[in-house]
């Protein structure tokens, strides 16, 4: 009710779900685009009542053009980062003897280039926004270094990912299956090992998402060389 969108739709009078349904029509991206553009121009209190300084750029799968999704501090803290804690908690409930937090998580996202709209507003892939704003304590458990994780040139990135992580105690991995397989194969080439479990003997969890894991599961089981847990996540 403290935003322009809220005032236009009388949010102050909303008490029940039916009130909201009556006042707010189903909106597509094109309906919200003018509001989002104003937010990208630096205006506050348009769709959200705290400053928005980050936008996630979609891949444009439903139209020819990419979409820009406002990312608030609240959505990062109470959504993405809270969900990460929930996943770890649920994993430990199922696996109370886990040694997951004794090592590091190898995080492999998509293209991570960060772009500036102006001095205050930035945009990038969601994975880039989440990594760039991640709480300080997450760096204790994550590999590689953020400067490598945020690289945009994939061939160089895979090489640096491989060389910088082969001597780490990696206990979990997170990323899309396609690029993760490319990385794991490169690590075996560099080390001369037959399986990833020889490189990272304490690896116990792979968090995957983005595409169906069914076509990749057998390849992962073979290249890792020992049973581990597989969990699908989506944000």
What positions do the PLM features span?
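Nucleotide 5′-phosphate-binding alpha/beta core
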Residues: 1-57, 63-205, 214-218
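Conserved AMP-binding/adenylate-forming
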Residues: 201-235
């Amino acid at each position: 009710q403290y935003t322009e969108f809220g005032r236009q739709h009388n949010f102050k009078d909303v008490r029940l779900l039916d009130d909201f349904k009556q006042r707010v029509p189903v909106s597509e991206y094109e309906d919200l685009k003018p509001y989002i553009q104003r937010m990208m121009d630096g205006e506050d209190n348009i769709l959200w009542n705290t400053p928005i300084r980050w936008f996630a750029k979609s891949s444009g799968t439903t139209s020819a053009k990419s979409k820009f999704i406002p990312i608030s501090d609240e959505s990062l803290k109470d959504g993405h980062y809270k969900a990460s804690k929930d996943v770890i908690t649920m994993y430990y409930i199922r696996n109370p003897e886990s040694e997951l937090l004794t090592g590091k998580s190898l995080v492999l996202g998509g293209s991570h280039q960060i772009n500036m709209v102006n001095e205050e507003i930035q945009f990038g892939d969601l994975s880039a926004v989440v990594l760039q704003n991640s709480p300080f304590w997450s760096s204790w458990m994550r590999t590689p270094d953020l400067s490598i994780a945020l690289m945009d040139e994939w061939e160089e990135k895979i090489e640096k990912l491989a060389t910088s992580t082969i001597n780490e105690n990696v206990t979990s991995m997170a990323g899309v299956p396609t690029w993760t397989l490319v990385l794991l194969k490169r690590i075996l080439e560099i080390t001369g090992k037959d399986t990833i479990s020889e490189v990272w003997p304490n690896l116990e969890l792979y968090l995957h998402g983005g595409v169906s894991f069914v076509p990749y599961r057998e390849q992962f089981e073979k290249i890792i060389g020992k049973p581990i847990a597989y969990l699908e996540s989506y944000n």
